[in-house]
Amino acid sequence: MTQLAIGEATPHGATYDGHGVNFTLFSAHAERVELCVFDSRGNERRYDLPGRRGDVWHGYLAGARPGLRYGYRVHGPWQPAQGHRFNPAKLLLDPYARRVEGELKDHPLLHGGHDEPDYRDNAAVAPKSVVISDHYDWEDDAAPRTPWGKTVIYEAHVKGLTYLHPELPQEIRGTYKALGHPVMVAYFKQLGITALELLPVAQFASEPRLQRMGLTNYWGYNPMAMFALHPAWASSPETALDEFRDAVKALHRAGIEVILDIVLNHSAELDLDGPTFSLRGIDNRSYYWIRDDGDYHNWTGCGNTLNLSHPDVVEYACECLRYWVETCHVDGFRFDLASVMGRTPTFRQDAPLFAAIKACPVLSTVKLIAEPWDIGEGGYQVGNFPPPFAEWNDHFRDAARRFWLPRNLTTGEFACRFAASSDVFKRNGRAPGASVNLLTAHDGFTLRDCVCFNQKHNEANGEENRDGTNSNYSDNHGKEGLGGPLDLMERRRDSIHALLATLLLSQGTPMLLAGDEHGHSQHGNNNAYCQDNALTWLDWQQANRGLTTFTAALIRLRQQIPALTGNSWWEEGDGNVRWLNKNAQPLSADEWQNGPKLMQILLSDRFLIAINATLEVTDIVLPEGEWRAVPPFAGEDNPVITAVWQGPAHGLCVFQRG
């Protein structure tokens, strides 16, 4: 290899052109940048990056090839009070690295220093960036582009979804390959979901605290390398990218979209006591929100917060998103703690990152879903994200649980949430699909645990049950824990059925947590982020097949109802919806606010949802005409009903006219 040529300032990262590699690194406050390359024995050779255009340092290494391991040492001031923490003793990952070798260990050499710099060299233990050459045959792949009105999202963990699946080859269980295997594709099609939303697949690390406890970060919300696939779920690190793309291609052929959960709000460098392995050492002041005392604004609860209003960090975030769309053909993103994306530092709908995404022809046309909060002041922003974002609707989640798992909730509040929370989302030209309705998600109780536990049971997490929310709106139906007498089990079943029907027959975009259609339980753990074990892995052999069939039938029913698939707001008299009482009369003002939980919802003038959320069997008079129960509510004997449905306690039934 020769000394570096000046090279080019773009594209960002390490780019192989067939003759060598061009390297670039953004740092506005650095005084010198060294490229460090490593041979197969770990010997290091350093080169100064000779070029600088604006704040991008660059150089070209002729003869360098894919597989080259590299990192950076960045020189500059150590001025913690001003937010500068340069320390050339620390080898740093390329923020644009497409592959990373090594894990982020809990090791003292990875600490950059607190008040004073730690000058011990960390190259022997630091993870290293790896140059790749990217060639992939997408064949005739095409994005499904499912309309929002027909979208049904299935949230799943790559490993947990398939690790225990007995029909998959042993060697691919819990991997990217399994996602596109015919067994899984057939299951997704049978269930009826249209989009697979994956918990983070970008390479992540386990926090030092978890490593000391013998636990791991299972969910993946501790990002280490935003452009690199997490290698643990691949046959080898070298094949991870192609195996993931193979899965995307197989899912697309079946008409199933792939949405990635992505973490742009913080990094695995954590607080000032965390490891220094990338952004902190490259340009701490630019990449993170820094307080006046030089410490971090911790609006994420993870120790640091990315400054997504800084122009170069906005560019970094957008390039990351474009990479996943253009290189991996993903169909959208769910943004973790997405209020951080709009901080300037206060939340603004016209924040720089939002404006950049909206202006991008690649990003503005994929599905964008916000988790519309963070833990900072003014962080709760449900309903306030600009188009084209959809948002997780926690109003729906809480209202559905409070309605069916006895709590105080008016019929009016329930109806509002059933109608895509128009009071929250009907603004700025947004459609009902902007409300992503959910009962459960990866964080919180599973659906089965919602009907089996009144209290969280997170002792296995090692925090003496202090972690996880206490606001679960759950009901154990008289006994804490799984199991119980037959009548209790039947009441729990009825509650699950009612909740699933509410989710899948409401206006908006439904999201189903993987395993809820099986009856999966985490035994009351509502924060299983560090449980990479049978607590979180779906047990397919113990799956409740009847519940799976029930769920699939609900999804099929949903796709038959124009009022739900049209993705337009319901207006009085438009034929989409009528709200009726138990006597088939329009609900009175008093019934909206003070009446019992008895109602009928007539959709598209031919589908009737009869609801009895009281604790008593109640007769419900159906509207004039002939009605027949439809699957999954129809039994073998399915007579026409012309007058009264005897609604069981906590019961719900759907009828079709004629």
UniProtKB/Swiss-Prot annotation:
Signal peptide: none annotated. Its EC number is 3.2.1.196. Gene3D superfamilies: Glycosidases (3.20.20.80), Golgi alpha-mannosidase II (2.60.40.1180), Immunoglobulins (2.60.40.10). NCBIfam families: glgX_debranch, PRK03705.1. HAMAP family: GlgX. Removes maltotriose and maltotetraose chains that are attached by 1,6-alpha-linkage to the limit dextrin main chain, generating a debranched limit dextrin. This is Glycogen debranching enzyme.
